[in-house]
């Protein structure tokens, strides 16, 4: 991405330099200081890792999957070691959209404000899942009540229980409705 790119509608992210290389990238209208993003499910809600890694050093991160209501996830055992590696079955455990907006997002907003003072940014993307189209709509409506989420990642691999357990991801019409 060139800094003089006339299609750029957003202020470019603060560059991260590696051996003099500008690492900035732009994707789907978002600017990232580098292409390193922590994937959903690997980084909790982000706030848990602030003491380990400065979030403003990442290009961004995707918070673990959020649903309209909290979910306890699967009962133990959730992990099993095999000769081929680890298997897990967490079951999409999460605190729910409302608790995320009330408990986690204010902390992320504070970290974003702190980063902005250093002319850095923290790009937060929320992973959203549901079992019906209405679940996705309602979850995003609740998350939109807060500030600081740059984009949504739709987890369309959850079973659509209203339609015989078919996942949205495998159904082109279902994906289009989401």
Go through each PLM region and give its residues:
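N-terminal capping/small domains of soluble enzymes
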Residues: 2-124, 129-131
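Conserved radical SAM core fold
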Residues: 67-72, 156-165
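Conserved small/polar residues in nucleotide/adenosyl-binding loops
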Residues: 176-178
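Glycine-rich beta-strand-to-loop/alpha-helix junction loops that act as flexible
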Residues: 40, 154-157
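Catalytic cores of alpha/beta
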Residues: 47-52, 134-146
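Alpha-helix N-cap and loop-to-helix initiation/capping positions
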Residues: 167-174
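Short, conserved acidic/polar surface loops in the N-terminal third of protein domains
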Residues: 72-76, 101, 136-139, 164-166
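Residues at the N-termini of beta-strands
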Residues: 60, 150-151
């Amino acid at each position: 991405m060139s800094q003089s790119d006339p299609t750029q509608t957003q202020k470019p992210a603060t560059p991260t330099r590696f051996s003099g290389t500008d690492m900035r990238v732009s994707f789907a209208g978002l600017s990232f200081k580098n292409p390193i993003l922590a994937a959903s499910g690997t980084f909790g809600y982000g706030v848990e890792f602030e003491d380990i890694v400065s979030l403003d050093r990442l290009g961004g991160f995707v918070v673990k999957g959020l649903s309209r209501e909290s979910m306890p996830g699967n009962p133990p055992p959730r992990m099993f070691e095999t000769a081929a590696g680890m298997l897990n079955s967490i079951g999409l455990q999460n605190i729910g959209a409302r608790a995320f907006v009330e408990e986690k997002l204010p902390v992320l907003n504070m970290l974003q404000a702190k980063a902005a003072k250093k002319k850095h940014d923290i790009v937060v993307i929320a992973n959203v899942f549901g079992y019906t189209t209405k679940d996705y709509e309602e979850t995003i409506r609740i998350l939109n009540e807060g500030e600081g989420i740059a984009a949504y990642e739709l987890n369309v691999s959850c079973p659509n229980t209203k339609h015989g357990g078919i996942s949205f991801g495998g159904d082109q019409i279902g994906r289009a409705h989401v």
